[in-house]
Regions:
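Sequence context surrounding c-type heme c attachment/ligation sites in exported
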Residues: 14
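Short, surface-exposed terminal/edge motifs of secreted or surface/virion proteins that either
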Residues: 17-25
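Glycine- and small/polar-enriched repetitive beta-structure motifs of secreted/surface proteins
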Residues: 35-285
Length: 285
């Protein structure tokens, strides 16, 4: 790069020039110093926290961080309409088209991916990684990793990892979903733990369930206080409550029965509506 005339830069030998905006200085051996804003392919890059107010803000992208006011500090946003509505929010990070688009005053959110946390207004301390993750969230202290993860949630303190995990959660809080479409249909239930692909997939309002293993408690809708560990354990349970199944296919056919305990592979596998049973051992009962 060869500075010419103090107003242009000559690039290579083609003779193409680039205008130097106000606030740009060139010093021998000191490189290029930028103290204002500049434009890259139509998008404005705001530097030094000087656009238009606030401290230590960095933004790149059309309308990114355009609403920032005094008191809105330490925000980093990259992408078209990313963080557009942030006014006094502090310490937010948004990367992706429409990421954190509606956020105004909340702080310490991380949104990475197209439309991640896009309608969040006041929820704080959320982490959303993946397109549409936590898209409609208004709650706080949620962690969502994966495309569409916790897309609708308004509750708080949820953790969801995996595409479409906790996707339909609206008001449910303190849920943990790890795996593809784990707890996908959950709406308002609290305190569920689902680990494994499609575990607790159909659960809507059943609370205090623990499902560990692929498709464990997959059909459960309103059943509560169940513990199911093992692939396909309690596979058919829909409304049964307070059951314990430990082992692959344990209590697999249970639908509405309560208060059963099955320990061992295929234990109580054929039970559907019987209650207060205890079976220990492979294929017991």
């Amino acid at each position: 790069i060869d500075p010419q005339s103090g107003t242009t830069l000559t690039l290579g030998t083609s003779g193409d020039t680039v205008s130097i905006p106000s606030g740009v200085s060139l010093a021998p051996g000191g490189g290029l110093t930028l103290t204002g804003n500049f434009v890259v392919d139509g998008g404005t890059v705001k530097l030094d926290g000087s656009y238009p107010t606030g401290v230590d803000n960095t933004a790149m992208g059309d309308t990114a961080l355009d609403s920032i006011q005094a008191g809105g500090n330490h925000n980093t946003v990259i992408g078209h309409n990313a963080g557009t509505a942030i006014t006094t929010g502090d310490g937010n990070t948004a990367v992706g088209d429409l990421a954190l688009d509606a956020n105004t005053t909340s702080s310490d959110n991380v949104a990475i991916g197209r439309c991640a946390l896009t309608t969040n207004i006041t929820g704080a301390n959320n982490v959303a990684v993946g397109s549409y993750s936590l898209r409609d969230s208004t709650g706080s202290d949620n962690v969502a990793v994966g495309q569409g993860s916790a897309l609708l949630t308004t509750g708080g303190c949820n953790v969801s990892v995996g595409s479409n995990s906790l996707k339909c959660n609206v008001g449910g809080s303190t849920n943990t979903a790890l795996g593809f479409e784990a707890l996908k249909a959950n709406t308002t239930a609290d305190n569920n733990t689902a680990v494994g692909a499609c575990s607790l997939n159909a659960n809507t309002t059943g609370a205090d369930n623990t499902a560990v293993g692929a498709e464990s408690l997959i059909a459960n809708t309103t059943g509560a206080n169940n513990t199911s560990v093992g692939k396909n354990s309690m596979l058919g349970n829909t409304e049964g409550a307070s059951n314990t199944a430990l082992g692959n296919n344990a209590l697999q056919c249970n639908t509405t029965a309560d208060n059963n305990t099955a320990v061992g592979r295929c234990a109580l596998r054929s039970n559907t509506t019987g209650t207060h049973n205890t079976a220990i051992g492979v294929e017991a009962l």
